Amino acid sequence: MLGYVKIDKGELKVREYEVYCGYYCGICKSIGRRYGQLPRMALSYDAAFLAILLASIEDAPDAPLQEHCVVHPIKKKTMIYNRAVDYAGDVMLLLAWYKLLDDAKDENRFYAKATMVLLRSIYRDLRKQYPDLCKGIEENLAKLAALEQAKCDSIDQAADAFSQIMKIIFQEGVRTLYEADAVTIEPEHPAKEHADPQFLIETAGQIGWHLGKWIYLIDAVDDIEENL
């Protein structure tokens, strides 16, 4: 259900596009550096959006680096590393795990089960690191599955379960940055009045909720012929 949040490349300046690519490639490199090469396949454009949004409240400015990677061994690519990048990578791996779990349960796919064996230890580590996040995702996935099984005829009710997942993801991202002391805005900063942690957490949650509803509806439109 992910992969819908993409850039409009024609509307970006060259510098802006380079920053976006830096986040996208930075997440990929971050996953590979911390978890190995195979999990990098979980990367999606949505992760770059999440990282850029969260990084916008970080204290440290972007610091692009030029590095090689497995996919681009000859020409160096722009990479950006920060706490938001690491968090976005962690979230993509968690969502990939739950997608594999659903595939293995509903469709009995050998690929899903085999990949889960390879990702199981990573999932366990992430679950220890983000217990509340995992609990929230699991509860709402169960709610969504129950609604789909009951053939719920309310699109808003069904969409809300997925929207809640995105809300939790965005809120946990802000909490993670504060816990890592990545957000420290000086008293004279013009955004100081909006720098209250609870305000940022609630605002990020609203962004995530509305984005989640849009993603759910767009995905439903894409699959409408298959589901009718």
Question: What label would you give each PLM region?
Answer:
Residues 1-206, 217-228:
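Acidic catalytic motifs of isoprenoid enzymes
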Residues 207-212:
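Membrane-embedded alpha-helical segments that form the functional core of polytopic membrane enzymes
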